[in-house]
Amino acid sequence: VEPQSNSPKKILFIDEQPICRLGMESLIERYPQFNLLGFATKLDDVEPSSISPDIIAIDIVVAKTNGIRALKDLKRKFSHASILVVTSHDETLFAERCLRAGAKGFSMKTAPIEELIQALGDVSRGRLYLSSKMRALILNRISEHEAERSRSRFERLSDRELLVIQHISQSMDNREIAKQMKISIKTIESHRSRIKSKLQLSSPSELVRFAMRLQNKAF
């Protein structure tokens, strides 16, 4: 187990609004686990040679042209710092993009103080931070995407191929399926091959698992 440092995590706050900078200063003073190194209003004001933060809290509004690209540039300049976006931008529109650009977390300025402190703590330990609302939204998107992908693949099957899958889900082998459907074993093998291709399944075992999930309405 690696020893954990008790030194306060150093924070650099980049925001063009004075009221936000004052609010952050007042907040951080109440939490000894953090140390506010300073403020900047523009990305050009920040250079690695002059400051070495553990956390960079930034409002992407400071980058007038492309805030997402600014995050990538910031990550290149401060490769050892964790970036937390603290902004009024809608998290449902910008959070995922910010994470892909290199941010470790995303917090709305309207979030409760406790959430911001949790966000700072999480990113300082190398963890990703998103609000509970945003985490649920992303999980729903993933679930809906997978369900839609399964449905679209499933609709490519012919009626006879669907019947073959039904028999596979009942643990029937090719000989039994051929007898049940009154067709040759070679035809069943051809059906199975086409089913795997249409469903993008790489092996017979994957086909069996898909058939079982379908039988249980869990695909």
Positions of PLM-derived features:
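Active-site residues of response regulator receiver
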Residues: 59-60, 87
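Basic, Lys/Arg-enriched C-terminal extension of HTH/homeodomain DNA-binding domains
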Residues: 193-219
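Short hydrophobic/Thr-rich beta-strand motif most characteristic of the beta2 strand and flanking loop
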Residues: 33-42, 201
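Acidic catalytic/metal-coordinating carboxylates
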Residues: 66-69
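Conserved acidic segment of CheY-like receiver
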Residues: 7-20, 24-28, 56, 157
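Helix-turn-helix DNA-binding segment
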Residues: 150-186
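Short, flexible helix-to-coil linker/hinge segments that flank and couple to helix-turn-helix
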Residues: 94-100, 104-159, 163, 213-218
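Acidic, metal-coordinating helix/loop segments flanking the phosphotransfer/catalytic sites
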Residues: 39-55
